Swiss-Prot record:
May modulate chromatin structure by regulation of nucleosome assembly/disassembly. The acidic domain is probably involved in the interaction with histones. Keywords: Chaperone, Coiled coil, Cytoplasm, Nucleus. InterPro entries: NAP-like_sf (IPR037231), NAP_family (IPR002164). PANTHER family: TESTIS-SPECIFIC Y-ENCODED PROTEIN. It comes from the Eukaryota. This is Nucleosome assembly protein 1-like 4. Belongs to the nucleosome assembly protein (NAP) family.
């Protein structure tokens, strides 16, 4: 899969004209089929029922208009409180990094701030723990802060990962930007763009060098392969290049990768960043486990009721 690099960011390549035409035609066919199903359902109804359904559809239209206003007001409210959160996040960052001392601290302390704060906060989350490998941990100990913000042009949101100077890569900040499009008043992921990491020689965590022994008279054969790493988060799934054909299996795999990538982003944005200390102390883990257990208990009670009804 080829990628273009510009201004330190990996740019996704566009679909070929042929692939675009195929996708557009497929989408048109699906929409046409849905429209025909809609008409078929209405025409199959008795006249009196059809009139009632027409009224229900008008009610739905009124609901949809209110829903649009809801999303607009929700976005404005989120923007308002994001600004109010800012000073709190800034103070948190200063305490974690040791820039701001806490009242009552003794002078006899071995280390500043809260070591491995973000590493442990992320590792305590089930989704992110699957992405963090043992080889990543030393590099993530240099993670100083994580921030996110909404962007308007294009619409979406952006992450910034701030790092101390470290032996793994040159970048002080790694970014990941998600471009969204509105579809039926719901934001849908269009593409994601990540920073190209400038690895120091011999420290790249997203590749591994494999060595194969050859005959005694020749040197060992070495080759480089991609490997699993948290830092692959900054190289998001991309559309295949112009030379590739998007078959059904490839499209499904790409869709799964993009959904997984967005799950990670949502977890960082909605859980880790706003509640970092709760994840660090594992309090958030207990809350999630309790919530899951409560749901399971509810389902078991429902099943018991069903069996009781059947026996009765």
């Amino acid at each position: 899969m080829n990628e273009e690099v510009e201004d330190g960011e990996v740019k996704p390549l566009e679909l070929s004209s042929e692939d675009k035409a195929i996708l557009v035609e497929t989408l048109k066919n699906k929409l046409q089929a849905l429209a025909e199903q809609h008409v078929d359902v209405l025409e199959s109804l008795a006249p009196s029922v059809r009139k009632r359904v027409d009224v229900l559809m008008e009610i739905q239209s009124q609901h949809d208009e209110l829903e649009v206003k809801f999303f607009e007001e929700k976005a404005a409210l989120e923007a308002k409180y994001q600004k109010l959160y800012g000073p709190l996040y800034s103070k948190r960052s200063k305490i974690v990094s040791g820039v701001l001392e806490v009242e009552g601290e003794t002078e006899e302390r071995e280390e500043k701030g809260v070591p491995d704060f973000w590493l442990n906060a992320m590792k305590n989350n089930e989704i992110l723990a699957e992405e963090i490998h043992e080889s990543d941990e030393e590099a993530l100990k240099y993670l100083k802060d994580i921030k996110w913000c909404r962007i308007d042009d294009p619409k979406g949101f952006k992450f910034e990962f701030f790092f101390y100077t470290n032996p793994f890569f040159k970048n002080q900040v790694l970014t990941k930007t998600y471009h969204m499009i509105d579809e039926d008043d719901e934001p849908i992921l269009e593409k994601a763009i990540g920073t190209e990491i400038e690895w120091h020689p011999g420290y790249c965590l997203t590749q591994e060098v494999l060595t194969k022994e050859s005959s005694e008279s020749t040197k060992p054969i070495t080759k480089t392969e991609e490997c699993e790493s948290f830092f692959n988060f900054f190289s998001p799934p991309q559309v295949p290049d112009d030379d590739a054909k998007i078959d059904e299996n490839t499209a499904e795999e790409l869709q799964n990768q993009m959904e997984r990538d967005y799950d990670i982003a949502s977890t960082l944005r909605d859980k880790i960043i706003p509640h970092a200390v709760s994840w660090f102390t594992r309090e958030a883990v207990q809350d999630e486990d309790y919530g899951a257990s409560w749901v399971d208990d509810e389902e078991e009670d429902d099943n018991d009721d069903e069996y009781s009804d059947e026996e009765a």
